[in-house]
Amino acid sequence: MSDLWIESVPNISEGRNRTIIDAIVDAARGFDDSAVLSAEPDADYNRTVITIAGSPDSVLEATISLIGKAAELIDMRQHEGAHPRMGAVDVCPFVPLSEGSHEACMRSVNSVLAEFGDTLPIYLYGDAATSEGRRSLAKLRRGEFEGLRDRLNEGDWADEETRMPDRWSGAWGEREQRFGAMAVGVRPVLVAYNINVNETEPVAS
């Protein structure tokens, strides 16, 4: 058992079809030294946030398995939801949990890049970003899935620094049309919460 602990938090673009969600989450189960801690679907966002934690090698294996299953089951051409997204696995951060585990997270990012980078457009963000201007997930995700085809085929794009993936085959095809693109990175622990406000006026909310 490794003394290093990390987690990955893949966000998948499916929050309504329980059969698909369960199949994707199950793909991350059954690996020694890691566990799925939570899977939190949101029907309005049509998105599920999944947390996998354990030893670096095991978390990586589980994450790669999950991404592969999501690529198989999610078709972004059928997706709609309230949350910004650009792919079937929209974002997959690796998070260091123990002292010295940051480097293990960086290695995990490189392994995901090696596994999927020849078939899926992958953007690196956060601590794994290849330039300061690419650290922000929001900047990389601008235009979302619907704008991806034009973005990657020399269409209008406001910021050339963020236009292209860090790795990709370079040819827009059926797999890209189904999956979209994915952001992978390293970030600290993030605490997020949502509040429901009983108010119809956005300004008042």
Each model region followed by its residue ranges:
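Long, contiguous binding/interaction regions
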Residues: 2-205
